[in-house]
Amino acid sequence: MNYGYACINMTLSDVPKSKRITTNRSMIKRTFLREGIQKASELALQNVLDLEKILKWNEQRDIRFYRMSSDIFPWASEYEYDDLPDISTIRRVLARIGEYAVSNAHRLTFHPGPFCCLASPKQSVVEKTYKELNNHSRIFDMMGFFPSHYNKINIHVGGTYGDKDETAKRFIENFHKPGGLDDNTKKRFTLENDDKESMWSTKDIYDKIYHETG
């Protein structure tokens, strides 16, 4: 049996701030507007360095499934990774993490939040979803992972918007839209059913979406 957990390691993070090991350091919008990508870069570097520590902690306890935080790069929707002052160091750390994960058979995944919605009738939401999902995939790329469902990026369909068939059609169109999702993002992409009967069941996803997206 394999064990895993999601995002926050309570043992390592529930300690005095100076000793805290966590991957979701962020800042409020006012701070971001004042300090910009320099501060975002510093926090992202601290987050990936701590991600490496968390995986080593996991390995010592035979924990090899880990869902990573979606907040590794603070305010990632507001800049490109390549513009970060520390991106070269961040890349090296992520590559090292990827090698460690492969060598020790760790499976790493992502589950972006509910604001990621390819089925949204609002194009602005869809565009933000493209960037969010592609950003997650780029982290895996920087780790050196071959794109597959083994390093999955898992989301929900979202709402039904009063018509499941039309929503499914819109989802499929947005999934395939040129210039939207990167190829590697599509190869890592998975959908999860909802718990509520009125939302998206496993059968709904299989019947209405799977056959058109794979």
Predicted regions and their residues:
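A broadly tuned preference for mixed-charge, low-complexity surface segments
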Residues: 114-124, 159-168
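Alpha/beta catalytic barrel-like cores
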Residues: 1-106, 116-119, 124-129, 137, ...
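Conserved, mostly hydrophobic/aromatic
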Residues: 111
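Eukaryote-skewed repeat-based solenoidal scaffolds used as protein-protein interaction platforms
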Residues: 133-214
